[in-house]
UniProtKB/Swiss-Prot annotation:
Its main location: plastid. This is Large ribosomal subunit protein uL14c. Binds to 23S rRNA. It is found in: Plastid, Chloroplast. The gene is rpl14. NCBIfam families: rplN_bact. GO terms for biological process: translation.
């Protein structure tokens, strides 16, 4: 469950390391974002000499949350951190690699490019 002022790790190689959520987009509850929701965030920590710089405002999709996600078959899934992947206006990732496991729900929400880059889909 991600809300405004929440910090997230960045799970790609776009150059950002941490982002802070400043707005939740396109969800039934605009206060909280879950896995697969698009957020607007500001880069708080970034690697040098990369395309994404510190204090850039970026769009990102949430790929992991510490809050347990309940699936329709009764199984719940929970990750060890809150993480997001930075995307462009066409919902394609800005980086070329994705790190760590990714939830299967992203495939249902038309983020198949991110799912194909992920090393593990849970």
């Amino acid at each position: 469950m991600i809300q405004t002022q929440s910090y997230l790790n960045v799970a790609d190689n776009s150059g950002a390391r941490k982002i802070m959520c400043i707005r939740v987009l396109g969800t039934s509850n605009p206060s909280y974002a879950s896995i697969g929701d698009v957020i607007i965030g500001v880069v708080k920590d970034a690697s040098p000499n990369m395309p994404v710089k510190r204090s850039d405002v970026v769009r990102a999709v949430v790929v992991r949350t510490r809050k347990a996600l309940r699936r329709t078959d009764g199984m719940s899934i929970r990750f060890g951190d809150n993480a997001a992947v930075i995307i462009n206006q066409d919902n394609n990732p800005r980086g070329t690699r994705v790190f760590g496991p990714i939830a299967r729900e992203l495939r249902d929400k038309n983020f198949s490019k991110i799912v194909s880059l992920a090393p593990e889909v849970v």
